């Protein structure tokens, strides 16, 4: 692959632009439901979350092969860690910490106009393997750079992004399982009634559908794609 970036794009307001994160799109059009669901998930993650983290200067992950880095800064910071599982997140955390601790103004960008096509896991076994790797890598990296957590010196990355990752990524499976167990236990002993549970579950489901539709619509508009009825049904489902 050949990627051409204008030299002037690496400097803006005297800040070193360390890296670019490209938007990636699943290709070809997935036939399995497992892969189709990831199309929506990727749109929600990259069209929404990365835009938001861009605004607050808190991007913590440049997705693997879909990023470009300033070579000299990467070398000065120590390069890739050979023992890192989530090497993409580890490098971004390392670069951010290095620049902040050495007083180097920097910027990490997500650029949606740069597009890279990729393939998603087509079955649950491959998806489980991928997500296990992501989860272990995130836990390893957050532990390695725990000095940044809630530390105002590291800006929004330490004060906001990392706490969000801990609450909604690392601890989310445990919280959800404990929540389900608590609801079942509460229903079984009569401590809670079924109606509030159904209302909250329905509200959560509707919010998820709405978020998916918004993300999907944004992706469709940006690519000027033609939609089929079954595509919209997959998104809602």
Sequence positions of predicted segments:
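A short, conserved alpha-helix in the catalytic core of glycosyltransferases
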Residues: 73-76, 84-109
């Amino acid at each position: 692959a050949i990627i051409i970036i204008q030299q002037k794009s690496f400097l803006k307001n005297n800040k070193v632009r360390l890296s670019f994160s490209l938007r990636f799109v699943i290709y070809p059009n997935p036939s399995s439901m497992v892969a189709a669901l990831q199309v929506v998930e990727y749109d929600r993650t990259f069209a929404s979350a990365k835009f938001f983290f861009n605004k607050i200067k808190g991007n913590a992950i440049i997705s693997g092969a879909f990023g470009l880095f300033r070579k000299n800064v990467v070398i000065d910071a120590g390069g890739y860690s050979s023992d890192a599982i989530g090497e993409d997140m580890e490098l971004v955390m390392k670069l951010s910490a290095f620049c902040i601790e050495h007083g180097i103004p920097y910027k990490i960008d997500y650029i949606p106009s740069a597009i890279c096509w990729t393939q998603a896991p087509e079955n649950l076994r491959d998806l489980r393997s991928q997500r296990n790797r992501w989860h272990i890598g995130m836990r390893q990296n957050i532990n390695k750079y725990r000095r940044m957590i809630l530390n105002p010196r590291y800006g929004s990355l330490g004060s906001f992004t990392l706490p969000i990752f801990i609450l909604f990524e690392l601890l989310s499976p445990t919280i959800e399982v404990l929540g389900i167990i608590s609801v079942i236990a509460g229903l079984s002993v009569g401590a809670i009634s079924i109606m509030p549970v159904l209302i909250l579950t329905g509200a959560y489901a509707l919010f998820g559908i709405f978020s998916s539709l918004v993300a999907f619509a944004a992706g469709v508009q940006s690519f000027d794609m033609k939609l089929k009825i079954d595509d919209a049904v997959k998104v809602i489902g």
